[in-house]
């Protein structure tokens, strides 16, 4: 029996998902960010919305009842995407997830999703306060918090770590990174209101001509039908987009770190010692 237990322990140690979670827990700035995101989700005032967001953080994948899981051929036809592949159901870990592809994305390390989410949330709050003070606009705080936390959750499913410590590249759906559309599909299945779905969808672009195709694709994946796109543009949607626009900096800082650091898991061990990639970037000539 002892040998069997040892084999299970060795297998767990070699599981990339387990290893990524362990790395994220050892990165102080990433683990602090994860705990703060969890606290922010738990502080959402609306009980139903709070429950939905907390559930999504704990289970950051496309719910298995999604229509496209049972009808992949039909989904590919409706989306005009013969290469559509969905991530395995019930696979993903918010704490372990990167914020982007490991080689050429932003926050491409275990725990990167938490760091990216918290930074975006802080930036969104600052913008909301600026608009309140300057323009007298009252922003729907719960909606903005929920949108920011929700938007990247499916990265946990679309960018799994491999045995060699790599992840990515990420596929696209309807011209957006797969996690974006799949996160909207998860929101539909978790019964988020349409106006909140619109705010989530606005992260990459506030342009309705881009948002509506993303929502339509998400609706096909979730329910096998296209949804009517909300027409009302909101301040919250624009704030979400502006807050989630630091990729030029964070992608550059991570790419510089990748160029200097070892490959694979050794890179993340180095990151534990170095602090974080943006900190080193700020010290560079």
Features from the language model and the residues they span:
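Hydrophobic alpha-helical targeting segments used for export or membrane insertion
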Residues: 4-13
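Residue-level marker of positions within ordered structural domains that often coincide
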Residues: 6, 125, 188
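Acidic/His-rich, divalent-metal-binding segments that scaffold phosphate/diphosphate chemistry
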Residues: 15-168
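Divalent metal-dependent catalytic cores for phosphoryl transfer on phosphate-bearing substrates
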Residues: 104, 109, 115, 132-260, ...
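Non-catalytic terminal regions of proteins
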Residues: 255-285
